[in-house]
């Protein structure tokens, strides 16, 4: 059975043409991207690394990592976002290899090939997140690192990530997220450990609606990222 939710893919297919519009529904992704890339780069030094971006969408993170000197492959199952990523690459001149393939299928093809894997804002959009995590373990080299980000599952996350972001502030289209698919840090940590990845660090990402700014924080109640290591 394929670990693909076609309804989730359809959501982003419909919005794909606005992926690089910084005032569109993707503004939050553009705003948080520098914070996330810096956090990752500080931990792995992206320059010269072979990197896989799982669930790359229109390529916002992929291009940013390539600009840091990484050799980046971006994968996604959405045809329209990948087309946008490839078109933007022609405009920007940033070199990224994009492929329409699942993490599980690529793991069969390219085991232990990547120094770093990123899988940001993707796990809450697939039927079986643990399957993606296992695939990431298989693809990262021993001693390599895998970064995940997602949204916590609790009342505060429901209020801020769905009611606040989708209905009140209208930062995201209604229906972007499904609360049932949100993932607690304890669950993400457990799936990672079962897959063979050691959790090294966790950081939260908070939004101030008054200043309209994001910052990294110890508060992991809503958005958060984790750093994991495949031991040598």
From Swiss-Prot:
Annotated organism of origin: Pseudomonas putida (strain W619)
Protein name (database record): Ubiquinone biosynthesis O-methyltransferase
CDD domains: AdoMet_MTases
Keyword Zinc-finger: no
Family under the similarity heading: Belongs to the methyltransferase superfamily. UbiG/COQ3 family.
UniProt-listed Enzyme Commission number(s): 2.1.1.222, 2.1.1.64
Disulfide bonds: none
Alphabetized Pfam families for the sequence: Methyltransf_23
Functional note: O-methyltransferase that catalyzes the 2 O-methylation steps in the ubiquinone biosynthetic pathway.
Xref: Gene3D superfamilies: Vaccinia Virus protein VP39 (3.40.50.150)
